[in-house]
Regions:
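Glycine-rich anion-binding loops and their surrounding alpha/beta cores
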Residues: 13-20, 25-185
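A short acidic, glycine/proline-enriched capping/turn motif at secondary-structure boundaries
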Residues: 1-2, 44
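Active-site-proximal loop->helix
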Residues: 2-18
């Protein structure tokens, strides 16, 4: 992970999923499981080359354009995409770019769990901003959890743990342990 204790790739690797595999493995996984995980380094070697600079900037709290480029150069070339951005100011330009890339439709999202904080994803805490592109181009604004039928959680519940803690949480969730995940009010 660049900006947290445990990112998606860290979790996948700890679960025994090989990240550096060729496209045929991804194709089989997608067909069999309806899921695959594209590790940027496997498809875009420049991401590996710039990792030291990205990590150094991340320790200073700096995000880079590479945080945005990864999802935009997805090797699967999906027809629809949900993409999070780390700053509200990127919502409109990225939505415009995704539309120009020829995707049928999707949403660009940004979460603000508490004032003066930011997430590059939708959040069950605070407020979410979104803008659609393509077939969803009329869909934009603020998403309130209540209007989506979801209960709001405390921002503290969203903080990730170590790789080991997150693996344990994932396994509990996968085994349908009702105590796993965000506690419901």
């Amino acid at each position: 992970s660049i900006t947290s204790k445990c990112g998606s790739a860290d979790l996948m690797e700890a679960l025994g999923i090989q990240l550096m595999v060729d496209l045929s493995v991804h194709r089989r996984a997608l067909e069999a499981l309806n899921f695959t995980f594209f590790f940027a380094h496997a498809f875009h070697p420049v991401f590996k080359a710039i990792m030291p600079a990205r990590k150094a900037l991340a320790t200073e709290g700096q995000k880079t354009i590479f945080n945005l480029l990864g999802p935009m150069i997805n090797p699967a070339q999906p027809k629809h995409q949900l993409m999070g951005v780390y700053s509200k100011s990127w919502i409109d330009p990225i939505a415009e770019a995704m539309g120009a890339l020829g995707l049928n439709g999707g949403l660009i999202v940004h979460g603000v769990p508490v004032p003066n904080s930011a997430l590059d994803e939708l959040s069950c805490a605070g407020v979410n901003y979104h803008k659609g592109f393509g077939t969803l181009s009329d869909y934009s604004g603020t998403l309130e959890l209540g209007t989506a039928g979801l209960a709001e959680c405390d921002a503290e519940d969203l903080k990730g743990g170590s790789v080991e803690e997150n693996v344990s949480l994932f396994i509990d969730f996968a085994e349908n342990n009702n105590d796993a995940g965000i506690k419901q009010g």
